[in-house]
């Protein structure tokens, strides 16, 4: 019932995004959950970093790539019975700990299976799952990926910065300059460990430079009220939005 109320409340031009591991029973259950939703981003991911390949999965590159390919095929399988519009998003989790050539290879393999179009591009999300470097290094990685993707016009290059080094906003802005098209973040930076990049902070920064962030940032007091009531967390009194 909650799901139905939620879907009825979502404007038609807003996409619901669901995050799923590349595991069939989770993908199947997710498609059952989103029935009735008109526009959905199916976001699949798997770990790709050198450390996770060796320590967590004990798999080589080809085996890790096959997980992503199989996950993409499963999404295509279950979307056949779905009435709404689907856009695929894929994340090589722990991108910042992954060799760039392998990150590119696995994304290209997913794209080959999915066959995106200019009208319905695939989203490749390149997360700083752990912020491991200075912002300029992350921006260099984003630029390299943007330059080396094939069919770049069929790709939305997304970033997902965490804030382990306290540089999430700087990393986001430099990544946008380096070729990123989209940012994933959270309200007031709320996220695991030291949090994710604050989307409102990014929006205010863009607005101050004469760029329309395409977010309604005028009603921030109500946003704060809902946030604090739902999370039981307070906005820092020195935050410029408080």
Residue ranges and their predicted role:
Residues 191-216:
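C-terminal helical cap(s) of enzyme catalytic domains, especially alpha/beta-barrels
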Residues 19, 43-47, 160:
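Short beta-strand segments
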Residues 26, 164-170:
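Short glycine/serine/threonine-rich phosphate/pyrophosphate-binding segments
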Residues 178-195:
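Glycine-rich phosphate-binding active-site loops on the catalytic face of alpha/beta enzymes
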Residues 13-20:
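Active-site cofactor/substrate anionic-group-binding motifs, chiefly glycine-
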Residues 1-6:
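Short, small-residue-biased leader/transition segments that mark boundaries at the very start
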Residues 9, 24-155, 173, 177-178:
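Alpha/beta enzyme core
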Residues 210-241:
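A mid-to-C-terminal "edge-of-domain" accessory segment
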């Amino acid at each position: 019932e909650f799901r139905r109320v939620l879907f009825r409340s979502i404007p038609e031009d807003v996409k619901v995004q669901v995050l799923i591991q590349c595991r069939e029973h989770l993908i199947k259950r997710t498609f059952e959950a989103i029935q009735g939703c008109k526009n959905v981003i199916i976001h699949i991911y798997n770990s790709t970093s050198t450390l996770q390949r060796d320590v967590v999965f004990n798999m080589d590159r080809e085996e890790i790539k096959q997980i992503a390919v199989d996950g993409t095929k499963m999404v295509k399988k279950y979307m056949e019975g779905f009435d709404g519009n689907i856009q695929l998003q894929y994340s090589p989790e722990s991108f910042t700990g992954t060799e760039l050539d392998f990150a590119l290879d696995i994304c290209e393999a997913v794209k080959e299976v999915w066959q995106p179009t200019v009208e319905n591009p695939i989203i490749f999300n390149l997360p700083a799952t752990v912020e491991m470097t200075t912002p300029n290094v992350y921006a260099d990685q984003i630029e390299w990926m943007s330059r080396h993707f094939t069919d770049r016009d069929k790709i939305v290059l997304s970033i997902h910065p965490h804030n382990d080094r306290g540089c999430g906003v700087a990393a986001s802005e430099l990544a946008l300059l380096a070729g990123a098209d989209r940012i994933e973040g959270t309200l007031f930076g709320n996220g695991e460990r030291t949090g994710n990049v604050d989307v409102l902070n990014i929006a205010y920064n863009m607005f101050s430079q004469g760029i329309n962030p395409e977010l309604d940032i005028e009603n921030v007091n109500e946003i704060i009220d809902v946030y604090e009531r739902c999370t039981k967390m307070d906005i820092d009194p020195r935050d410029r939005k408080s």
